[in-house]
C-alpha cells in the first residue's frame, strides 16, 4: 500500500533537457553555457533552441 499523497509531486519533464544534454557533451558549448547560459550557448553552436 503506497501513501502517494505524502510524497512530492513528480516534476514536469523539462522540454529542453535533451538539448541541454547535447550542449553538456560538447566541452566548448558546456564551457560557454557556464558563462552566458545554456540557451544562448546552444543557439550559438546549434541554432535556435
UniProtKB/Swiss-Prot annotation:
Modification sites for 4-hydroxyproline: 9
> Would you identify the family this protein belongs to, as annotated?
Belongs to the osteocalcin/matrix Gla protein family.
Q: What is the lineage of its organism?
A: Eukaryota, Metazoa, Chordata, Craniata, Vertebrata
Its source organism is Macaca fascicularis (Crab-eating macaque)
Provide this UniProt record's keywords sorted from A to Z: Biomineralization, Calcium, Disulfide bond, Gamma-carboxyglutamic acid, Hormone, Hydroxylation, Metal-binding, Secreted
* Amino acids binding Ca(2+) 2: 21, 24
Name the SMART domains for this protein. GLA (SM00069)
Q: Show the stretches that span the lipid bilayer.
A: none
Record protein name field: Osteocalcin
An annotated GO BP: type B pancreatic cell proliferation
Calcium among keywords: yes
Chain positions with 4-carboxyglutamate modification: 17, 21, 24
Q: Name one GO molecular function term.
A: hydroxyapatite binding
Domain Gla residue range list = 1-47
Name the gene: BGLAP
Annotated Ca(2+) 3 binding sites: 24, 30
* Superkingdom, natural source: Eukaryota
Amino acid at each position: 500500500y503506497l501513501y502517494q499523497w505524502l510524497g512530492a509531486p513528480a516534476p514536469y519533464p523539462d522540454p529542453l533537457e535533451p538539448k541541454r544534454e547535447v550542449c553538456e557533451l560538447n566541452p566548448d558549448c558546456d564551457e560557454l553555457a557556464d558563462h552566458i547560459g545554456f540557451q544562448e550557448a546552444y543557439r550559438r553552436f546549434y541554432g535556435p533552441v
